Swiss-Prot record:
The protein, known as: Glutamate receptor-interacting protein 2
Main location per the UniProt record: cytoplasm
GO cellular component labels: cell cortex; cytoplasm; mitochondrial cloud; pole plasm
Organism listed in the record: Xenopus laevis (African clawed frog)
Residue numbers spanned by region Disordered: 408-460, 754-783, 853-872, 936-965
Length: 1083
């Protein structure tokens, strides 16, 4: 470690403070010490090394005939202790090997133990040992790096050293050890005078070696590190870590300081000077500080500090050259009177936080003080301070406009206009270490901004948001980010640093999510606000070594104009190779425009504040997209340069504003207390279809609030918007919501309920066939449900296996338009009046902890002989009793038992319900569209919708082939496949479906594990080891299969038609109806 001793001398009479920095080279340095003195000191200090601090190394020396080792040994059985190195002759073989330190103990020479030898015997042995000398050396391990010291901070630097023999002119000790108590960093314990490291001048005793020629020395033993150094070329690039002192005296100084620094004769301080103007007077300022120099390490001087005097000589009338010459003429102790930079200019913070108060000390640089020409400024005679002039001057400081570009004249900063203002400064936190800051709670992880609107640059109304960005760079070029914050590098920041500059064609620019002026909140989880600018830069440099960094940034989003509906234009700046941040989706439905399906947070598109998912893209640069495909639109965008003009249409249904068509929006907070919410939500996997509440449990939590009703649309769950999210994501959010669930509800004051279609109506007489596309869109927007028939997911064991009435005969995805009855009592009445259940059901997901609503299910007891002649039998005692039992459990407070039942249902364990899960049949009648779920003697039926969609001719032909197939039947099976250890595979391949989502068995190796397990070609894989794969493609499913281990548990869907093998997977697996096909492209 490299230490500095600080002595404070308070001079109350003259109003000055004095700080003295004396260099202490630590216990390993011997350059300027008398060898005899070292010997005596070591005798008193080190008779032996405690085991926990003892290190051992092997030193091999090759001496020429007639030459000596240049090594002085003291000790022996007849002397004062164990044999040890008491002196190394400068220029001798032992000194130039750079492997020995004075004070090292010699245990053995060429395998001969020295413990029981007298002093003369040891000397004789060394003289007659031969050309090759192998020494076993014990040394004291270097002290560990302090973890919680707030008085120093580490920095790193790369230096290049020339090799001299097999070494670079320094001794290092430490390294990894099998006993973790003895593991240390590789620490420099001695720099040989005149050696390569000494001539270069940067490396000092106490510095840690991190890397050599790109080879990391982390967790490397001392022996391996020496071997790496010997194998280096003639020029080695070293990355070293050194310590910089944090001087509270300097940071908290209220006026000039007298700084005394001791340096080695012939060495330089490591500062360069320049001239500047302060209060209309020319001053000498520190322009730059050389990294790892004496000045940098002491932490007392910083760029921007004013030098008032050098060794008592005033610099008021000195030129830059004269001041530099004056510094160079000082041999050892340098005495400088400085004015720290934070007292010579405005602090980097908004003007309302600037506080100017009268100083008790008057110096030659004050505008109201007559300077008396004396080399001792403390002896100046000063007149009485003029309060009035001081007050006026303070007013002018506070009234001055402040911006991030106002520090352009400050050394070390360049003028950059920021489009984001610094945040309001909070009270400065106490200085903490990086480890403590890493454990601090983040306050910026909300996905929705909770901050209120503020006024930004130019009077624009903005709000702040934050996001996390992953950048990938390289150690040579980094990430392309330059930061700005504070006055000097070691000042503790009271607000996060700003991004000052983004390098062209760097990872930061190419990601398209960063802009100049953004606030950097954290780097790899470490908050930047309580650290220093140098620490932030160091974190970026360290992250570059691993080629990856996670940045949390805060930025401004404009909200001066936020259109709720209508058509408008948006202009976005575009740079070559940088994404706009929008993802567009194309719908196959004729006449439907392209849709913005996603917007990257932090992108140019997001910061405008006017675009949101669901907006329609009508034109790009005045080129209408009516007849353009998504690929054409992408091509048009790629050809745009500098500025992109987008024509956008926002529908009222895509707006969350309360002013839209009489909607009322409010927030409801539900506290579960371990119980169920009591709601059933419905929706589809289409990203912009609404998610509504389709059922409420009688006397349940949601119903008791009186604020939630059937038909209400859910806009957000726990402040996470559902816009652009499918039903599955909404379900996941509810499952992960915890004890408190906050729902943002949108209620239509005038609800339009869908009219039920006649039971006798067939597909050809669908009344919606006569509607135009725009009328269909309007109608669907009035209905709270637009797709997927209803299957209650309380039986999650079925849903987890891919069984869903919204999926075709093979469990494939069929996005079909359906409605929902919003009045359960009407539904129940209609069931009593008619044997045919309602035509339109929705895909519903109740959150009732496993309770079943009687009205949600139809339970026929036998399969009808005629497709259109379904007979409904109300002898459904099992399901009625089961549902009533669950309701009784809920009302009597048995929530724990309810949760156990829910757990068994959610994990797919049908056996827990007393049902036979060995085989589940889903039979689809080709004419009536009725779907039956059969389990043992219990049957559940629901109806498929009868909407006819406009299909392409090719799709129609495939559909007709499926309709012509005889009584298609779907069988769902659980299959276990054991891996073949000889071939290390499961013996089958998979492929994607052609007309629908899903993964299917493609080929099976005869006699292989899959063949022996009963797997068949064309089986659809619905679940892999309890992971649903029904909506996956091969890219997502194959990794699951690869990581399955030796056992594969599959849930498959198998078609039993006699024509299955003849028609092929694309025909059998194809859905009976197809409304839309959506593809996406990220721009």
């Amino acid at each position: 470690m490299h230490f500095f001793q600080t002595i404070l001398r308070w001079k109350t009479a003259k109003g000055q403070k004095s700080v003295t920095f004396k260099k202490d080279d630590g216990p390993y340095s011997k350059g300027n010490k008398d060898p005899a003195g070292n010997d005596l000191a070591l005798v008193s200090r080190r008779q032996s090394i405690p085991e926990e601090f003892r290190g051992v190394t092997i030193v091999e020396l090759i001496k020429k005939e007639g030459s000596t080792l240049g090594l002085t040994i003291s000790g022996g059985t007849d002397k004062d202790g164990k044999p040890r190195v008491s002196n190394l002759r400068p220029g001798g073989l032992a000194a130039r090997s750079d492997q020995l330190n004075i004070g090292d103990y010699i245990k053995s020479v060429n395998g001969i133990n020295l413990t029981k030898l007298r002093h003369e015997e040891i000397i004789s042995l060394l003289k007659n040992v031969g050309e090759r000398v192998v020494l076993e050396v014990e040394y004291e391990l270097p002290p560990g790096t302090p973890d919680n010291s707030s008085a120093i901070i580490p920095k790193t630097i790369e230096i290049t050293l020339c090799k001299e023999g097999n070494s670079f002119g320094f001794v290092m000790r430490g390294g990894a050890h099998e006993d973790w108590h003895k593991s240390r960093a590789l620490v420099v314990t001695y720099v040989r005078p005149g050696g390569p490291a000494d001539r270069e001048g940067t490396l000092k005793v106490g510095d840690r070696l991190l890397c050599v020629d790109g080879i990391s020395l982390h967790n490397i033993t001392h022996t391996d590190a020496l071997s790496i150094l010997r194998q280096c070329s003639q020029e080695g690039v070293f990355q070293i870590e050194y310590d910089v002192a944090l001087m509270d005296t300097v940071t908290n100084a209220s006026g000039p300081l007298l700084v005394e620094i001791a340096k080695t004769p012939g060495s330089t301080l490591g500062i360069s000077l320049s001239t500047g103007t302060h209060r209309n007077k020319q001053v000498i300022v520190i322009d730059k500080v050389k990294p790892a120099s004496v000045v940098d390490r002491c932490g007392a001087l910083h760029p921007g500090d004013h030098i008032l005097s050098i060794d008592g000589t005033s610099t008021e009338h000195c030129t830059q050259m004269e001041a530099t010459q004056l510094l160079a003429s000082i041999i050892e102790n340098v005495k400088l009177e400085i004015l720290p930079a934070h007292h010579s200019r405005l602090p980097l913070r908004p003007p309302e936080t600037v506080k100017v108060q009268k100083s008790d000390h008057h110096h030659c640089w004050d505008p109201c003080v007559n300077y008396c020409h004396t080399p001792h400024p403390g002896h100046c005679k000063t007149p009485t301070w003029n309060p009035t002039s001081n007050q006026d001057y303070c007013k002018s400081l506070v009234a001055a406009n402040f911006s991030s570009s106002s520090v352009a004249g400050t050394p070390g900063f360049s003028s950059q206009n920021s489009n984001t203002l610094p945040r309001t400064v909070h009270p400065m936190s106490p200085r903490t270490t990086m480890n403590r800051r890493r454990q601090k709670r983040k306050d910026h992880k909300s996905s929705l901004s909770l901050a209120s609107s503020t006024v930004g640059p130019g009077g624009q109304i903005i709000h702040t948001e934050s996001t996390e960005i992953i950048l990938r760079g390289d150690p040579l070029n980094g990430f392309g980010i330059q930061l700005q914050g504070g006055i000097f590098a070691t000042e503790t920041l009271s607000s996060p640093p700003l991004i000052r500059f983004i390098e062209p064609d760097s990872p930061a620019e190419r990601c398209g999510l960063l802009q100049v002026g953004d606030r950097l909140l954290s780097i790899n989880g470490i908050l930047t606000e309580d650290g220093t600018l140098e620490e932030a830069n160091q974190l970026l440099r360290d992250a570059a070594l691993s080629n990856k960094v996670a940045l949390e940034i805060e930025f401004d989003v404009a909200e001066s104009v936020v259109p709720s509906s209508g058509t408008f234009h948006v202009k976005l700046p575009k740079r070559k190779g940088v994404e706009l941040g929008i993802t567009i989706s194309s719908s196959r439905k004729p006449g439907e425009p392209l849709i913005i399906s996603d917007i990257k947070k932090g992108s140019v598109a997001h910061r405008t504040g006017t675009l949101e998912p669901g907006d329609k893209l009508l034109a790009i640069d005045n080129i209408r997209l009516d007849n353009c495909s998504m690929e054409d639109a992408v091509q048009i965008l790629r050809q745009c340069e500098d500025l992109v003009k987008l024509k956008i249409r926002k529908d009222e249904d895509n707006s969350d504003e309360q002013e839209t068509s009489g909607a009322i929006i409010y927030t409801v907070e539900l506290k579960r207390y371990g119980g169920p919410l009591g709601i059933t939500i419905s929706g589809t996997e289409e990203p912009f279809d609404p998610i509504v509440i389709s059922g409420l449990t009688k006397r349940g939590l949601a119903e008791r609030t009186g604020a939630i009703h059937i038909g209400d649309r859910i806009l957000a769950i726990n402040n996470i918007s559902l816009k652009g999210k499918p039903l599955s994501e909404a379900i996941h959010l509810l499952q992960m919501a915890g004890e408190t669930v906050t729902l943002k509800i949108k209620k239509q004051t005038e609800r339009i309920f869908p009219q039920r279609l006649s039971d006798s109506m067939n597909e050809g007489s669908d009344p919606e066939d006569d509607l135009t596309d725009s009328q269909k869109t309007s109608k669907l927007s009035e209905i709270y449900s637009t797709t997927v028939p209803s299957v209650d997911s309380a039986l999650e064991s079925w849903d987890g296996s891919g069984i869903d009435a919204g999926y075709g005969s093979q469990g494939t995805y069929v996005p079909q338009a359906v409605g929902i009855s919003l009045h359960p009592h009407e539904w129940r009445t209609s069931r009593q009046k008619s044997n045919t259940p309602p035509v339109e059901h929705r895909k519903s997901y109740p959150f009732l902890d496993g309770s079943f609503n009687e009205q949600d299910w139809e339970k026929p007891t036998r399969y009808p002989s005629q497709p259109n002649g379904l007979e409904t039998d109300h002898d459904d005692s099992f399901w009625r009793v089961f549902g009533e039992a669950l309701e009784d459990l809920e009302t009597c407070g048995q929530s724990e038992l309810l949760r156990e039942i829910e757990a068994s249902i959610m994990t797919g364990s049908v056996q827990d319900l007393g049902l036979d899960s060995s085989q589940i049949l889903l039979e689809n009648s080709s004419q009536g569209g009725h779907v039956l779920f059969r389990r043992g003697s219990h049957h559940i039926s629901s109806n498929s919708p009868k909407k006819e969609n406009k299909l392409s001719q090719d799709a129609r032909s495939k559909k007709e082939e499926v309709h012509n197939a005889q009584s298609l039947t779907t069988e769902l099976l659980k299959v276990t496949v054991q891996k073949d250890m000889d071939t290390d595979d499961f013996g089958f391949s998979v492929s994607d479906g052609l007309l629908e989502k899903g993964v299917y068995v493609n080929m099976i190796r005869p006699g292989g594990p899959a063949d022996r397990s009963g797997l068949k070609t064309y089986d659809q894989i619905l679940q892999v080891n309890h992971v649903r794969t029904r909506d996956f493609d091969c890219c997502l499913t194959v990794p699951l299969l690869s990581d399955a281990g030796d056992r594969l548990d599959l849930v498959i869907s198998r078609g039993l038609s006699i024509k299955a093998e003849e028609m092929g997977v694309e025909q059998i697996k194809g859905p009976l109806r197809m409304e839309t096909q959506t593809s996406t492209k990220t721009l």
